[in-house]
Regions:
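Short, small/polar-rich loop/turn modules that mediate ligand/substrate recognition or access, typified
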Residues: 173, 178, 233-235
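Conserved glycine-rich cofactor-binding loop
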Residues: 6, 13-15
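The beta1-alpha1 cofactor-binding region of Rossmann-like NAD(H)/NADP(H)-dependent oxidoreductases
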Residues: 39, 60-72, 103, 216-217
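Substrate-binding pocket helix/loop in short-chain dehydrogenase/reductase
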Residues: 97-98, 102-110, 192, 203
Length: 246
């Protein structure tokens, strides 16, 4: 389905990003595993892909750094000659009630989650415009749609990702580039592992399907949006959340 496609996935060393990288590679894409934390985790993702017959490389880069993102994209283009799929998944949380939230906690979350998404799109778009093709998939969150107590920074960043998605779809669509977002709900990752059992149980009670999502649930949606089956879909936010009662 994605043979000969080059895909960059940010924050691909764990969780949703890891699942997306593995899923895209399974469909034939050659993936670039971006990471900024554990090199060992990135190596594990690369090894998993290669053991399954796929192709992958690794690139360490802090996506909140504009110049570093520019260098990363240039290196990818130099290595492969093209970039077909960009998945903006890198994200962090620093939760806290607004009256206790530190300025640096607000800034750091927006710098990674929102500015990081802008940075990679900004530098990837030039190549995709030349190609007159490309798939950009931004990972948002239902927190950016519904809001969530204790997540003023995270919700604001993910709402910003939705606004950025809709605007970029309008700007880039005439050159054959689609831009969509996925808004996951509760997903079993390290981000949700820190939740107490009581909070998890209460959350599951609000989800009509009765469970947290799996990273693969999000990855399957990303594979669809990256494929030619989604060529006529752009400027959409696909909510993957098991239907939360609010």
């Amino acid at each position: 389905m994605l043979k000969n496609k080059i895909a960059l996935i940010t924050g691909a060393g764990r969780g949703i990003g890891r699942a997306i990288a593995i899923a895209l590679a399974k469909e034939g894409a050659e993936v670039v595993i971006n990471y900024n934390g554990s090199e060992e985790r990135a190596k594990e993702v690369k090894q998993t892909i290669e053991e399954n017959g796929g192709k992958a490389s690794m690139y360490k880069c802090n996506v909140s750094d504009f110049a570093a993102c520019e260098a990363m994209i240039k290196d990818i283009i130099k290595e492969y000659g093209h970039l077909d799929i960009l998945v903006n998944n890198a994200g962090i949380t620093k939760d806290g009630l607004i009256m206790k939230m530190k300025e640096e906690d607000f800034d750091s979350v927006l710098n990674v989650n929102l500015k990081g998404t802008f940075n990679t799109i900004r530098h990837s778009a030039r190549q995709m415009l030349k190609q007159r093709s490309g798939k950009i998939i931004n990972i948002s969150s239902v927190s950016g749609i519904l809001g969530n107590v204790g997540q003023a920074n995270y919700a604001a960043s993910k709402a910003g990702v939705i606004g950025l998605t809709k605007t970029m779809a309008r700007e880039l669509g005439s050159r054959g580039i689609t831009v969509n977002a996925i808004a996951p709900g509760f997903v079993d990752t390290e981000m949700t592992e820190v939740l107490s059992e009581e909070i998890r149980e209460n959350a599951c009670k609000q989800i009509i399907l009765g469970r947290f999502g799996k990273p693969e649930d999000i990855a399957n949606t990303a594979v669809f949006l990256a494929s030619d089956k989604a060529d006529y879909i752009t400027r959409h936010v696909i909510i993957v959340y098991g239907c939360i009662n609010v």
